[in-house]
């Protein structure tokens, strides 16, 4: 996909203005790929700019540029967003670039070739047709940016939960617990979960998490931790936004002038000598 974008003559526009857009714009800049505009969903335009681009509406982008390539820069499980994406896909050339949650390694054709042995080894270990189909679809999506590959291997929520078999007295770690929605979801779905460690770094979201846990009438014992999960213990100065969760932290170095400093903790420290299922 990245090589294709280098050679296209169509104007390229970004859909979304969050952390994903930052990462995608950085990658495009590194590859000397020009971006012609940025637009947001209706209700999120609000007379603002992003990285030097005026944030436009979809209709304004189309009026100004005509036939465009859209790069979607965020993820969502909301049905209204899904329907809008399907509409945009029908009207435009549309891609969802795969960029890492952390780090800067891009899963492109070169990465695939360099790690082909490991990837084929993983595929050979999959035990059923659905798993192989899903693996192939994810690989095709990550290389092409074509989200329809992912749509083709979707399963109903109940079916996905049925694939998880937990032993009695399992412990569940929620490493980005947000407001506690997934704590509630999986505690209700899996009665074999006896304890939960829910970690959330953002102070506002952490308050929501605590409130959610307090309102749980029954279920597992829940320990809430206001920290950011890392590969080591220490302190981190965070850069928060109004979106879901925390978006960056500065190499686990505590900046004494920062207004938002929280502990960082490793999974090993969270669980100590206990087994995680």
Predicted feature locations:
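Phosphate/nucleotide-binding beta-alpha loop and adjacent structural elements of enzyme active sites
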Residues: 1-31, 35, 41-277
